[in-house]
Amino acid sequence: MAGLMKLACLIFACMIVAGPITSNAALSCGTVSGYVAPCIGYLAQNAPAVPTACCSGVTSLNNMARTTPDRQQACRCLVGAANALPTINVARAAGLPKACGVNIPYKISKTTNCNSVK
């Protein structure tokens, strides 16, 4: 559990640093990370089911990402987080929006082309 917390902190720090690199978007990677942080245990297969707080964060993030630049930025942040988490279960990541009852216009994966997100 301590290792998972260290990893979450590392990802959060990376997202804060990477956030200003791209941006006409209002969303920062720090913001995105904050919304999906409750999902880390589930995505790393330490939780058997998607936590309610995770789905609340996914839903809130989806509601915030209204413009194409915001959706592309959220996508970039999620792809970056997926690549930074070596223990992530990619099938769980890809299925997370559906598990939370949210439709997003792209698949969460380590290789998603976020420039194609509209």
From Swiss-Prot:
Belongs to the plant LTP family. InterPro entries: Bifun_inhib/LTP/seed_sf (IPR036312), Bifunc_inhib/LTP/seed_store (IPR016140), Plant_nsLTP (IPR000528). SMART domains: AAI. Disulfide bonds join C29-C77, C39-C54, C55-C100, C75-C114. CDD domains: nsLTP1 (cd01960). GO terms for molecular function: lipid binding. Plant non-specific lipid-transfer proteins transfer phospholipids as well as galactolipids across membranes. May play a role in wax or cutin deposition in the cell walls of expanding epidermal cells and certain secretory tissues. Keywords: Disulfide bond, Lipid-binding, Signal, Transport. GO terms for biological process: lipid transport. Residues 1-25 form the signal peptide. This is Non-specific lipid-transfer protein D. The gene is WAX9D.
